[in-house]
């Protein structure tokens, strides 16, 4: 099955000049979603994770059921102020400013293997920050994965772990 047939491009969203790749058209078709999850499971299983870290917010849609399928735990990488209790964060640069990604302070035990999962890799800034945050708390990060990669933005170049995507767009 060609997963690209189930992903729609929406021009000028969220702002003019951006082509948004919408996974909602894939996940609402059970067969396409099953195929995507099966392929992601094969990619991620090879790294023997203890936990999957889903990147806010569409990464949760993939990482949570994938963790269940693989028999490992799931944690959330969230924007500042979205998690209850004590948190640990990592500040990172955006094109015009800064942002912060956080996890709950007790989410990861030192030495646990955590694979980062998101719906899409664009410039790689958020995923790279998530990897750094996980290492900050003592996690081992053997890999990262996404459903979609915008290869022309070269986001994988910002990652210092193996990265795999199921679908790649060159423009």
Swiss-Prot record:
Database matches in Gene3D superfamilies: 3.40.50.2020
Protein's UniProt keywords contain Iron: no
Annotated InterPro entries: Ade_phspho_trans, PRibTrfase_dom, PRTase-like, UPRTase/APRTase
Gene Ontology MF term list: adenine binding; adenine phosphoribosyltransferase activity; AMP binding
Keywords assigned by UniProt, alphabetized: Cytoplasm, Glycosyltransferase, Purine salvage, Transferase
Catalytic activity reported: AMP + diphosphate = 5-phospho-alpha-D-ribose 1-diphosphate + adenine
Pfam families documented for this protein: Pribosyltran (PF00156)
Any one GO cellular component localisation term in the record: cytoplasm
Any one GO biological process: adenine salvage
Compartment list: Cytoplasm
Enzyme Commission number(s): 2.4.2.7
Group of enzyme by EC: transferase
Pathway: Purine metabolism; AMP biosynthesis via salvage pathway; AMP from adenine: step 1/1
UniProt keyword Manganese, yes or no: no
Family as reported in the entry's similarity comment: Belongs to the purine/pyrimidine phosphoribosyltransferase family.
PANTHER family: ADENINE PHOSPHORIBOSYLTRANSFERASE
Assembly notes: Homodimer.
Protein name listed in UniProt: Adenine phosphoribosyltransferase
């Amino acid at each position: 099955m060609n997963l690209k047939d189930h992903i729609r491009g929406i021009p000028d969203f969220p702002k003019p000049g951006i082509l948004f790749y919408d996974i909602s058209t894939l996940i609402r078709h059970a067969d396409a979603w099953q195929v995507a999850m099966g392929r992601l499971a094969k990619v991620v299983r090879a790294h023997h994770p203890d936990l999957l870290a889903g990147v806010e917010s569409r990464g949760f849609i993939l990482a949570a059921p994938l963790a269940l399928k693989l028999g490992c735990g799931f944690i959330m990488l969230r924007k500042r102020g979205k998690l209850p209790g004590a948190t640990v964060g990592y500040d990172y640069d955006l094109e015009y400013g800064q942002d912060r990604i956080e996890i709950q302070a007790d989410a990861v035990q030192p030495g646990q293997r955590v694979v980062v999962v998101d719906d899409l890799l664009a410039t790689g800034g958020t995923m790279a920050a998530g990897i750094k945050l996980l290492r900050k708390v003592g996690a081992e990060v053997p890999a990262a994965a996404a459903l979609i990669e915008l290869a022309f933005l070269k986001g994988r170049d910002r990652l210092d772990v193996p990265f795999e995507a199921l679908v790649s767009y060159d423009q």
